[in-house]
Amino acid sequence: MRSSLLTLPKSFLGFMPLYLAVEIVLGISILNKCSGAYGILALFTGHPLDFMQWIAYLWSVFTLIVFSQGLYLIHKPNLLVFSQICVLYTIDTISTCFFTLWFTTQWFTLEDTANIDGNNALQSNPISTGKLTERGIDISKQSATESYEYTMTILITLVSLIFRFYFNFILASFVQELLHHPKYLVDRDDVEQNLKNKPIWKRLWAKSQKGCYKLCKNLLE
């Protein structure tokens, strides 16, 4: 048996068993992905969604289904299912970094535009000098508050991403443990035999799981 390409944690924070850690990780992820299902409800309220929001919300709904399946099977783990979860969680981590960067950039751009518009309006209004000075003080305080908000937003985002990557390693470690346990080994011939008379969407889903299993086996075993 060749060694894994990765050195992964064998417990959560050094004391919690992997299966409990995976249960926590999936539970947190499911709660997080519920925001995607909630975002889709914007269709019924008439709130406009741009293309990136559509992608983010639809992906959240899809991963919500996959992660829920894993949470249901955590005490009777299936290697195919958890291989798929591990790969999708990794893709989700990468996409989360991308969407975080995208939406944060959009937010900062809107805030800067609003500040510029406010300053232009202030300069163009014929108001008294006393009011102008008072307004200038308010803008200075507002700028300091916004700088603090930006710093805290970036800090919280970075901490969240660090935990996200750690959760990813926990899932990979759990799949690695399943790969090393004979009880959970997958017989590919049996899988193919069971799929012959299944609907096409089930066959495609099973092929996706098999592809994820092969990838995890190559990287983690």
UniProtKB/Swiss-Prot annotation:
Pfam families, A to Z: Kei1
InterPro entries for this protein: Kei1
Gene Ontology MF terms: inositol phosphoceramide synthase regulator activity
Region (COPI vesicle-binding) location: 176-221
Any one GO CC term of the record: cytoplasm
Membrane topology: Multi-pass membrane protein
Signal peptide: none
Modification after translation (UniProt): The precursor protein is cleaved into two polypeptide chains, KEI1N and KEI1C. The cleavage is performed in the Golgi apparatus by the KEX2 protease which recognizes residue Arg-135. Generation of KEX2 cleavage site may have been an accidental event in evolution without specific advantages or disadvantages in IPC synthesis.
Quaternary context: Component of the inositol phosphorylceramide synthase complex composed of at least AUR1 and KEI1. Interacts (via C-terminal region) with COP1 and SEC21. Note=The interaction with AUR1 seems to occur with the full-length protein before cleavage by KEX2 since both full-length and short chains of KEI1 interact with AUR1.
Function summary: Regulatory component of the inositol phosphorylceramide (ICP) synthase which catalyzes the addition of a phosphorylinositol group onto ceramide to form inositol phosphorylceramide, an essential step in sphingolipid biosynthesis. Helps the medial Golgi localization of IPC synthase in a COPI vesicle-dependent manner.
Protein family: Belongs to the KEI1 family.
Protein name per the record: Inositol phosphorylceramide synthase regulatory subunit KEI1
Organism: Saccharomyces cerevisiae (strain ATCC 204508 / S288c) (Baker's yeast)
